[in-house]
Amino acid sequence: MAKGIFIVGTDTDIGKTVVTAGLMHVLRSRGYNAVYFKAALSGALEIDNKLIPSDTKLVSDVSKLEEPYENITPYVYRTGVSPHLAARLENNPMDLDIVKEKYVYLKEKYDFIIAEGSGGIVCPLIDDGRGVYTIGNLIKDLNMSVIIVASAGLGTINHTVLTAKYIENLGIKIEGIIINKYEKDLFYDDNIGMIEKITKLPIVAKLKNIKDMNDNEIEAIRIHSEKAFSAENIIKHMEQL
């Protein structure tokens, strides 16, 4: 039976896709049968009249994952807004049964699943008149625990603590926090220490700020993730699905 973890960011564009790509690379490059899953992506690329989920492409390219995009990201939207609104604008509402079918398929095919959210923990996926269904609801339905991706910079204490407390209030287990865009600095280190004290959560890893992303994005992520993560530590924080 597969083991897995759900990656949640404290905000949009916090770098959780880069972190997820790095985690996937470390596992797969060491022979672990790992797969990526993202239920919905908005703001997709359009290449040759076909929508390409950019996050899914990046993770797949970095980790050399060859699973078809439609199996690991079942809902892809062109419009770069929250998935619930993109679904309404493009008349393509999410069907949770399809999302869960894809997830079960991946659980049966792979040994490890790293899932990634859209936006933050409260990002709405569905708003169909019966209530709002968020990333938090999806995590509970998939019965996954989470790792929070946070920055080390200004505002991170507030963002990270609020995210952690909200997740805990949902009854979801938090395995720890990964700090992204980290540099050795008194200010950053004090922020990280304060987050640990207030949340009582471990810092799982710190990923450096990847400054050479534009030159060779894929190779830069691989190199820096190998310094920040170990396969054993990643697996240690996964739970049976």
From Swiss-Prot:
Keywords: ATP-binding, Biotin biosynthesis, Cytoplasm, Ligase, Magnesium, Metal-binding, Nucleotide-binding. It catalyses: (7R,8S)-7,8-diammoniononanoate + CO2 + ATP = (4R,5S)-dethiobiotin + ADP + phosphate + 3 H(+). Mg(2+) binds at T17, D55, E116. Its EC number is 6.3.3.3. The keyword Magnesium applies. GO terms for molecular function: ATP binding; dethiobiotin synthase activity; magnesium ion binding. Transmembrane segments: none annotated. Pathway: Cofactor biosynthesis; biotin biosynthesis; biotin from 7,8-diaminononanoate: step 1/2. HAMAP family: BioD. PANTHER family: ATP-DEPENDENT DETHIOBIOTIN SYNTHETASE BIOD 2 (PTHR43210:SF2), DETHIOBIOTIN SYNTHETASE (PTHR43210). This is ATP-dependent dethiobiotin synthetase BioD.
